[in-house]
Amino acid sequence: DCGYNDPDDLFLIGESGGFLLNIQPGDKFVNTHLFTEAADFYRKNKQYTFYKVDSIPHRQFRKREEYRRRHGFTAPCLLRNGVVQDVRITGGMYNYLNYTMIEQLDTTTAKATLKASTGKKKYDFPKFIDAQFWTWHVMEFAVNNGFHLIIDKTRRGGFSYIMASDTANELNLNSRKVAIHVAADKKYLTATGGLTDFTINNLRFYETKTPFVRGLLTTNA
């Protein structure tokens, strides 16, 4: 209503003129497996589709998934006032949930005592987290309205995975795209577990495991 690009009506303007998240009391996300059907299929079958490469159904699948990675995906996953409603995740979040592998705790191995907690790690697709739903929408809102964005984040909260996924998604979807990563020390970018390292891993995943092969990945200087 105030001239901002907010198609999902997720933002309010506060008394100070700043933006607030339009979170309604009692809202709850449900049926979130509908957001991750591509990831679930890959986890089960070790591939995203059974269609023959470059067949018409394969091309249609690729175009559909590229559209979702760019524009987002809507599904009946929001419970509000006792009624399940459609809600959209952003294209970046759709890509993150379905085409990004991250290191995470294998909950089947978790053990806790009064003194310590232990568990093994595994690589898998991210789980849907409601806080990240808002993170991705804030990022999209900033881009769509020409704003700069500073995120005050916690350490070890998965933001490097999120930003690397976003970078890789933009580079894979768009030709002649440039992404710049900056850090106080380059080891936070290029060393194993750094932002750029994660991004390269994501680009390699596109090239080797998905229908989105572009043949452009090289790490040669």
Identify what each model region corresponds to:
Residues D1-A221:
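Phosphate/NTP-binding elements of NTP-utilizing enzymes
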